[in-house]
Amino acid sequence: MPALDLIRPSVTAMRVIASVNDGFARELKLPPHIRSLGLITADSDDVTYIAADEATKQAMVEVVYGRSLYAGAAHGPSPTAGEVLIMLGGPNPAEVRAGLDAMVASIENGAAFQWANDAENTAFLAHVVSRTGSYLSSTAGIALGDPMAYLVAPPLEATFGIDAAMKSADVQLVTYVPPPSETNYSAAFLTGSQAACKAACNAFTDAVLDIARNPVQRA
């Protein structure tokens, strides 16, 4: 895989809880209309968050839980743990299964990290979510349906790249994840028009690739 090739993630485990135990539902603080849960793990957290947002657009589901695991998929407690756990909540098993199906399709064929170099040791994500669903719009505090540039890279690359992205287009920083995240990366959500978000993603990509080519730039 040379630089810019996609790094395709995998779903590592998936189950449906058709009817959640009442006591467990209270512990999870589920609203009364959530009776079923879809559980899914995958080996790329940010790709899975994007997929979860897609599920909210294709099925009557909500993301009731989503957390990354510490240190990434390579250091998980089991092969099925992956890098992230998502719980989709819905009124019945059919809606939850539809949401999980949407997530699997997105994980396998949608947004993906890319290699920044031929050595395949630096990965980044620069993806335009053209129309946010309920999950990402709520997370970022933007209006439902607003476009978003979803940017992730290692700490220095992300810091340099986010600045470059914001200088390149008419975009607003709505979420910043300083390093280190649970997986030792850094991230930002930018919002603006689709064209502006695309320009921001391109500038972020160029910045990450520039560091990959020449890591130590002396003044």
Swiss-Prot record:
One of its GO terms (cellular component) is ethanolamine degradation polyhedral organelle. It is found in: Bacterial microcompartment. GO terms for molecular function: structural molecule activity. The record marks Y70, N184 as: Important for gating. Pathway: Amine and polyamine degradation; ethanolamine degradation. A component of the bacterial microcompartment (BMC) shell dedicated to ethanolamine degradation. Forms a hexagonal trimer with 3 small channels and a large central pore that has been seen in both open and closed forms and is probably used for gated transport into and out of the BMC. Ethanolamine-binding by the small channels has been hypothesized to stabilize the EutL central pore in a closed (non-transporting) state. An open pore is thought to be large enough to transport ATP and/or cobalamin. Expression of eutK, eutL, eutM, eutN, eutS (eutSMNLK) in E.coli leads to formation of a single BMC. Has 2 BMC domains which can evolve independently of each other. This is Bacterial microcompartment shell protein EutL. It comes from Salmonella typhimurium (strain LT2 / SGSC1412 / ATCC 700720).
